[in-house]
Every structure is written in structure tokens, then in C-alpha cells.
Design a protein with these regions (language model features):
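Short, surface-exposed "cap/lid" segments of acyl-processing enzymes
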Residues: 38-71, 78
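Catalytic nucleophile-loop/oxyanion-hole region of alpha/beta-hydrolase
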Residues: 57, 67, 83-113
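Catalytic histidine-centered segment of alpha/beta-hydrolase-like enzymes
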Residues: 239-253
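Hydrolase active-site cap/lid region
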Residues: 133-185, 195
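An N-terminal hydrophobic leader/cap segment in hydrolases
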Residues: 1-25, 36, 270
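Acidic catalytic loop of the alpha/beta-hydrolase fold
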Residues: 209-214, 242-243
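Short alpha-helix in the alpha/beta-hydrolase fold that links the catalytic acid
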Residues: 201, 215-224
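Short beta-strand/loop motif that positions the catalytic acidic residue
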Residues: 198-200, 205-207, 211
């Protein structure tokens, strides 16, 4: 699916933050990506990976306000546009090569001197799914997955069920749609449930209980499948897909900050998250 390119509305200056405009290349195909580096003078850095139809200024999450709050907690931040979004190059196609864009962001942060164990990722929706895929292949310090689906197929089934569509027609048409998307648009299947067990870093799963896109069963399944008993699932009452921060900003920042303080401190050492 081709993603429309939305303009950036606002900047870190809008919420009182100093920042640097940065640019780096995606892995493999070298698509130019643009973003903001926001310093907090800490020794850890968090990468925010927006949802598929958004850019680094994601109003569904309020990434600028979230950035302000996380900087106040002492975390340096990198917000960037995935390919074909915002000011980045390339064409925006849902779920195609997003993990390589994340890889480019990690490479950039390593070039700034951050060790792997001090880098965390927060991903939303399809950005969460792609972050899970990336972390299943490469070690990072910690991972927060907000609104992550188990598989594209499960997400389609969930949407069909909500709309009263029987499962049989979905079973008939879905394989053909997936094949056409792969042939014509370079779509790559991203199914976190197939790879989450390979994620070696600590993971915090966040699920909004009134989410009409991702079912509660999905995040419970991801947490259980991950196989790490120290991974955590936070089920957020009274809010919808990717809106947990908007609904409960103080609690959200506290939980995410506490998680990363433990994860980024103990990665690679014996500690509460060691496996």
C-alpha cells in the first residue's frame, strides 16, 4: 500500500526543546532519511518509530509532547521519518523495509558513540512490528512495543470480525492480496509472533484495551510467545489504539522511563532482565 506523504506540523522547539536536524541512510538501499536528534545530556538514547501512516510528528501519539517528557527524564532522543514519510526520501509503502530504516537509525547513533546496550526503541503499530523484526536480528538495549500486532493475517481477521465479515471470504482472498502486494509494491510480511522469541533484549508490551485494530489476545500472545518471563505487558484501560500516552501521560512516561532505566542499565550484565 502506498503511504501518502504528510507534512511535518511543529518541531521540538514547539515544546521548548533544543534539537539538531540530522540525516542518515537506510541500510541496504541507502534511502536518505531525516530526523531530529534531541539531547538531554544523558548516556542513553531512545529512538521513536512512528506508525505507518504518520511521520516523526505523530499526532496519534503526540510524539513531540512525549519527547519533551522523556528528555526531562534524562533520555537523549532520535525522532525520524521512515522512508516516503515527512522529509525522508524514497516511497512510503506499508511495512516494506522499515526495519532497514530502523537499522540506519541505529547505525547513526552508534556513529555518535552510543553503545548498543544504551540504545532503546519505542515503536507504534506497524512501527512496533518492524522494531520487533529488527530487534529479533540485532541486539539493542530495550524495546517498547505499543499497539503491536501478532501478524498481518490476525489483524485482518480481527478487522473482519469487528465488521461482521465471515472468516471464509478472508481465507479465500487474503493469499492473493498478499501476493499482489509483494509483486507490485515490494510488500514484505512482518509477523512479530514468528520472531519475537528471538528478541534478546527486555520488552515492554503496551496494549490499549479499547483498541479496535489490535485485539488484547494479540499482545497476550506476543508476551507469552516471547518466552522471557521478565518481559512485561501493560494493558491500558479506557483508551484506543496508540492513545495510551494521550490518556495517561504521567503514568505512561513513568512506566516507560522505569522500564528503560532498568533495561539499559542491566543489558549485557546479570540483572533483573538477564536470560
Amino acid at each position: 500500500m502506498q503511504i501518502p506523504r504528510l507534512p511535518l506540523v511543529g518541531s521540538p522547539a514547539s515544546v521548548g526543546l533544543t534539537f539538531q536536524d540530522v540525516a542518515f541512510a537506510s541500510r541496504v538501499d541507502g534511502v536518505p532519511l531525516k530526523g531530529w536528534f534531541i539531547p538531554a545530556l544523558g548516556d542513553s538514547v531512545l529512538v521513536i518509530v512512528h506508525g505507518g501512516f504518520q511521520n516523526r510528528v505523530d499526532p496519534t501519539v503526540d510524539t513531540l509532547d512525549l519527547a519533551r517528557d522523556l528528555v526531562h527524564e534524562g533520555y537523549d532522543l532520535l525522532l525520524f521519518d521512515l522512508r516516503g514519510r515527512g522529509e525522508s526520501g524514497g516511497k512510503g509503502r506499508s511495512l516494506s523495509n522499515i526495519d532497514e530504516d530502523i537499522g540506519g537509525a541505529i547505525d547513526y547513533l552508534k556513529s555518535r558513540g552510543y553503545p548498543t546496550g544504551k540504545i532503546g526503541i519505542i515503536g507504534y503499530c506497524s512501527g512496533a512490528a518492524s522494531a520487533c523484526l529488527f530487534a529479533s536480528r540485532e541486539r539493542i538495549g530495550g524495546l517498547v512495543l505499543d499497539g503491536c500486532f501478532t501478524s498481518v493475517k490476525d489483524m485482518v481477521y480481527n478487522q473482519a470480525s469487528i465488521r461482521g465479515i465471515p472468516r471464509l471470504p478472508v481465507d479465500v482472498f487474503l493469499p492473493g492480496l498478499e501476493l499482489a502486494a509483494k509483486v507490485f509494491y515490494g510488500y514484505e510480511a512482518v509477523n512479530p509472533v514468528d520472531v519475537v522469541r528471538n528478541v534478546q533484549c527486555p520488552v515492554l508490551f503496551i496494549h490499549e484495551e479499547d483498541d479496535d485494530l489490535i485485539s488484547t489476545v494479540d499482545d497476550v500472545k506476543l508476551t507469552d510467545t516471547s518466552g522471557n518471563p521478565t518481559n512485561m505487558l501493560w494493558e491500558v484501560d479506557g483508551t484506543v489504539h496508540s492513545k495510551a500516552y494521550q490518556a495517561y501521560p504521567v503514568e505512561y512516561v513513568a512506566k516507560v522511563s522505569e522500564f528503560f532505566r532498568a533495561a539499559l542499565m542491566t543489558t549485557g550484565q546479570a540483572g533483573m532482565f538477564s536470560q
